Amino acid sequence: PTDIGAGHRGASMGPEALRVAGLAEALRERGLEVVDTGNLVGPFNPWLPPTEGYRHLEQVVAWNQLVMDAMYAQLQLGRLPILLGGDHCLGVGSITAVARWCRENGKTLRVLWLDAHADFNTSDVTPSGNIHGMPVSCLCGLGPRPLTHLGGASPALRPSEIRQVGIRSVDQGEKRLIKEYGLDVYDMRYIDEIGMKHAMAEALEGIDANTHVHVSFDVDFLDPA
């Protein structure tokens, strides 16, 4: 667990908090087999200022490589991996792994990005340099090569493969990029108008039995950060 891509401490405590809260037991009570493979161990957070628009790029790449390898290994075993972060920069590694597995197995991919933020910043428009605000842009091929090519192929995702739900905070530079790349965004204004049920029905429209659905969930989707 890590907060390497964030600007504040705390996200690294997420996995242990969920364990203590009884996540595994709750899943087992629903008849699921749960295997806790333990924590990944990566570089410490040096808490340095941004360099060329990115904070801790080297460490972020290392963590996402670990995540990608771990996720892909579980998919290869036929399991459904659940990654407990950690800040949302780890979405680069997890979704890159899923996208690779889908390509190799002839599956279409639909990513549901449940978040208060669009996370589509780049080094040119980011107000902070924190890479937890950039995972979606990196997955779509915008960003430093070590992240955009983490799985070898770039982009890992096409904009048409992702639906962003619950968005309520978008930086000015992001708005232009989101419009340029044609992302499907279901922001809170739209959800307030039509309701979450209808918004999710739209976000899931077009999936079939050959579609692998991946959910990437940020806790501020429920409560503003």
Give, region by region, the residue ranges found by the protein language model.
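Conserved alpha-helical scaffold segments that buttress catalytic/binding sites
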Residues: P1-A225
